[in-house]
Amino acid sequence: MPELAVMELGRQLCGKMKKQRKAEMTVLTVMKGLEIHFYLPDTHQLEYFKDCHTAEDLCVEGCQEDATSHLCADNLFALSEESQDLWYAPNHAFKITEETSIKLHYRMRFYFTNWHAPVRTESPVWRHSLFKHKGVSVSPKGPEGTPLLDAASLEYLFAQGQYDFLRGLAPVRAPQNEAEKHEIENECLGMAVLAITHHAKSNDLPLSGVGAETSYKRFIPDSLNRTIKQRNFSHVYVYNNVFKNFLNEFNSKTIQDSNITLYDLKVKYLSTLETLTQGLGRETIEPKILKVSGESDGSPALTLPSGDDGLGYEVQVSGTTGISWRRKPVPNILIVKDKTKSKKNKADKQSKKEMTKRKTVMTIFSDFFEITHIVIKESCATIYSQDNKTMELDLFYRDAALSFAALVDGYFRLTVDAHHYLCTEVAPSSVVQNLENGCHGPICTEYAIHKLRQEGNEEGTYVLRWSCTDYNYIIMTVVCIEMDLCESRPVPQYKNFQIETSPQGYRLYGTDTFRPTLKELLEHLQGQNLRTENLRFQPVLVGLGQPRKISNLLVMTRDREPDSQRQPQVSQLSFHRILKEEIVQGEHLGRGTRTNIYSGVLKLKSEDDDDMGGYSQEVKVILKVLGSGHRDISLAFFETASMMRQISHKHIALLYGVCVRHQENIMVEEFVQYGPLDLFMRRQSIPLSTAWKFQVAKQLAGALSYLEDKKLVHGNVCSKNILVARDGLDGEGGPFIKLSDPGIPITVLSREECVDRLPWIAPECVQDTANLSIAADKWGFGTTLWEICYNGEIPLKDKKLTEKERFYAAQCQLASPDCEELAKLMTHCMTYDPRQRLFFRAIVRDIDMVEKQNPSIQPVPMLEVDPTVFEKRFLKKIRDLGEGHFGKVELCRYDPRGDRTGELVAVKSLKPENREEQSSNLWREIHILRELYHENIVKYKGIWHEEGGRSIKLIMEFLPAGSLKEYLPRNKAHIDLKTLLNYAVQICQGMDLLASRNYIHRDLAARNVLVENENTVKIGDFGLTKSIKDNEGYYTVKDDLDSPVFWYAPECLIHCKFYRASDVWSFGVTMYELLTYCDISCSPMSVFLTMIGPTHGQMTVTRLVKVLEEGKRLPKPDGCSDRLYCLMRRCWEATPEKRIDFKGLIANFQQMIDNQ
């Protein structure tokens, strides 16, 4: 190098050093108020000296300052305080006083790597496109949607990227060796080339001499500048010349020959910045303590403190990968090789191994669509994901926790749901207001029209959306019906109306009146007629609709599209087939809607068992059996199983599969230890804590949020369909619940059955079961939350079906808890407009918010329980007791506690084929037994009904000894005449009560007298019993039923008239049965058939009447005294008026007993 050149270079360097020292000695003036600085050189800072401003409002003003579109401004930018390394949440309020001194930077915070899509190994990033959603083919090389950034946003990002690169806010990656170090330096110089060229082109400077005019040092990181300064003059001189030559060659050949644009330079600069720097596109948070936990096994959270080396853990948030964490890596220190040594010593080798080991891989916690909500408590931020996994970060101060929550919340809105917030503490006021008003963000016109088409294109319906271009306008896109002159039919057209926003309020553009709020303006417009051109209509708002609605607000990637884009396959039935040999049916546990529930065992095979032919494992399961009598709803049953097959969630019960056994269809589901939630809650002697109840509610809401994301409808959300897997009463781990299958869907139930399920069924589904949707599950959740609050109490349990219908018709609400926020949450779930019900993600978030208030839930006053109303699911069948022509009687255990301590009862029901015809008779029997209470009449316990009351069952006391017809032959040796007379007295006493109440039994026989014990009998089976009027004294049979003719008096057979005395005749026949010990060979039917000869049908009655008119009667039984037989004959007088009554019979029998 020539000596003069070296001297000149030294003089220039000395001059620059003096200027630098002079600048450092300059005393800065203290700023006042709040300043927002921009990275664009021509944009002046914003200054505020008074009032209160939110970060979101300041961001909007910043976007307007640099001409960023509303679409990009709405969710990409935030305010940062560099001195504190802090981002402010959008709802943070800056209260500016005379003492305020805050300097903020307006920055793009939310960044997606590969948004420019040059890296083929990574997924490109784009805003959602309707064309792709509709299945329109897109070129694999071209964009799959609209670009992520507009021109102004790209310009600003480029300026921000330069700033971060030069000042080390985006530090270059650490080199692993000397070669890579030189490679990184060259890349930094390449960045300078791009920046200088962009500077020259944007300012219309000649490219040929730009290298001589501009120093590269202004465009490389400060750290690299310091490194270059430490080198000798000759090396720097060469360095400068090499750079100038490369810059000139790049501008003269590459730029001009390839027609490179400013846009290309920006994209190349930013894409290179992603690979050259470390951490671009992701934020790294270093908490004091990190806790990561999963809830499945109830284990405590995994606490991750600092290690022995003082290094803790770090959490990274990225727009493309979600949230992850790892142990902080050891700082990489570049060791320069000592050329005098041929080998490293063993200590160096060991050190290198340790360093490699410490470069830990990131562990994924969750993607954004898996997050349900975020909770802030002081300086701790806790993220909850589906399956109730949690990540808790204990940060150094509260603002850091809010900053972290705002980061995750912002990415969630960009990638999952543009109209939802995960955390109330950082919720943007614009999102909250949009939700309240049913207004969309700045979606484009195509999406507004798409939504209106989905809603049916009804005239006057409109979508509210913020303008994509103008921050001061809201657009109403309205459906207008016009006549198509060519096709002579009405067709929908879409008109846009503008709503102007200003400090005075809101007004429809072109009108004069401002309304203070958007909601008031919309309410005003609701009753108005709007006109446009020659059209006139009344506006009707279409709300935001279901969560995760597609729009151009969503940022998409090929490998991470929301589940809502993939429709569940419900049309194709799919479930695992279980062979009948693989299940063993156990005891009856109760009844569901048209199903019977049993315990059972499922035999499972392993891969080795396939060869051996055996089973290696047995699992306890629940069997839900749909009987052969319900084959008409088998398809609906299979659809439920197919839906459950698509589900995998720890808070939803596992469906093993379906077994077809003969004509029965069986759903095989996992056994859950503590059974239904409502029974569990009622069994607790000590009140359950509020925290316990909230944990159950959150788990249920999380499971339903999972179903909502998959667009699957449960359809029968209630506490008896929630199973308790872990009670959590000891405080360890808390409760753990599982949502069971919905059973038979309401779409195949009758209206009466649907009304019977109120208030769990949503009102719109009562009107038409085809309205069953996810919104119905939200109503069911609201009702279930009410049950949980009140310890399993049944809402509206004292209401009849008609009263329940009126409850809905009047749009009534259940009694609200004392806690105002909890009552508000229930109301939002149970609003009668299904479109206004909260999304389950919002429900999960709000439950946590209410829980933080630590409310006390006062139990409702316990209503008096009707002991005569039995719930069908608690009737556990043991065996059949008997069967007649019209019905049957079963022995069941009524076991509401589920611990096999319930009482045994007899359950009488009609056969399905006789249900329509005979139900009135069974109801009559129920009403009679309700009114009769006597020690010698079988006790009425109550009823249960299903199918909306169309199917009923009579619950009576169970008498294990059976009827006299069965009891007497078995115990003849132990029963003497006195015992028989005692039985006769008891029967007469019961019949006398019946007669005094103006009832006629009409079916008195030994088969209908039940034995309680060896000393007591009771009259049963009042199925044919009739009520008579006082002034008539008889009842005329008007139905053609099978009748016990051999026990009937002549007037019954001839005139079909029944008197009280007719029962006396039947008693005489019953007395004959007692005295013959119900011997089949001499039964009344056998004796009378012998008298009348072979016959059948109506001829039997005719011949029987003739025999009776001839005065023939049943003979005197063996061992019967003349006095006793004479008394029996008095029961068989041909004329009813001449027959003895029951009081007379009692007196005579009592005398006989006394004489024994």
From Swiss-Prot:
GO terms for biological process: cell differentiation; cell surface receptor signaling pathway via JAK-STAT; cytokine-mediated signaling pathway; growth hormone receptor signaling pathway via JAK-STAT; intracellular signal transduction; protein phosphorylation. The keyword Manganese does not apply. Residues 438-543 form the SH2 domain. Keywords: ATP-binding, Kinase, Magnesium, Membrane, Metal-binding, Nucleotide-binding, Phosphoprotein, Repeat, SH2 domain, Transferase, Tyrosine-protein kinase. Mn(2+) was used in the in vitro kinase assay but Mg(2+) is likely to be the in vivo cofactor. It is a peripheral membrane protein. Residues 583-857, 875-1153 form the Protein kinase domain. The modification Phosphotyrosine is found at residues 1034-1035. GO terms for molecular function: ATP binding; growth hormone receptor binding; metal ion binding; non-membrane spanning protein tyrosine kinase activity. Belongs to the protein kinase superfamily. Tyr protein kinase family. JAK subfamily. This is Tyrosine-protein kinase JAK1. It comes from Cyprinus carpio (Common carp).
